[in-house]
């Protein structure tokens, strides 16, 4: 998804923006109140005409969520730990609107436009409630650590990705029709598509036969060198993987709608001036 990347360490020092481990060691204060507040906000005001409400109430969801990691050693989790929570929080996703991202958190969410154009994992109830929060369990009362969480690199991969890995898998499994995947084609250090990314590990493998096509949007950052293009490098690898799964595949670089979004913040960039002449923008 889809997709700055998502890691929940059961040490659970994580955020959906996939910040570095050393930055995510202090648990979110008042975790229960934040969870319940976001849940109620979502229930009453968020995505009302776009995504359905879930049957479980907010306190039942909290109980199920807390049970998954509380009174356990920080790294004593696996990819099944949050299974019951995600079953309770599951939503039907609109056809042809599911979007994944890798390395382009801000751009992807600006483009998705709060669900009006596309749905991201962070627009779903679980993603909305837990986005950017940090938590971890402990064996003693009150069952979770309120002062510090261990660096997630100290946990096994199945533990540190137990929440967001399951979130990504569940989200992808609910997708139908055409799905969209936005990637960064200007990062010299990280390929646009990586098999070990959350998209590569959890989202792409969990797409079902209800999906018809994977549509890739390659974003080239303004003023930066173009590293990856459709049909070459890691994007060719992705195309082969997608077609092997019998899905259709499309790839486009900086479509007009994305370019205009980038240029809104930097209208004087060379690419924006060229686009202005090409598209005859006043």
Swiss-Prot record:
InterPro entries xref list: ADP-ribosyl_cyclase
Species per Swiss-Prot/TrEMBL record: Aplysia kurodai (Kuroda's sea hare)
Reported function: Synthesizes cyclic ADP-ribose (cADPR), a second messenger for calcium mobilization from endoplasmic reticulum. Might make the Ca(2+) mobilizer nicotinate-adenine dinucleotide phosphate. Does not have cADPR hydrolase activity.
Signal sequence segment: 1-24
Protein name: ADP-ribosyl cyclase/cyclic ADP-ribose hydrolase
EC number: 3.2.2.-, 3.2.2.6, 2.4.99.20
GO cellular component, one term: plasma membrane
Keywords: Calcium, Cytoplasmic vesicle, Disulfide bond, Fertilization, Hydrolase, NAD, NADP, Signal, Transferase
Disulfide pairings: 39-58, 75-155, 136-149, 230-251, 263-272
Main location: cytoplasm
CDD domains noted in UniProt: Rib_hydrolase
Compartments in which it is found: Cytoplasmic vesicle
A matching Pfam family: Rib_hydrolayse
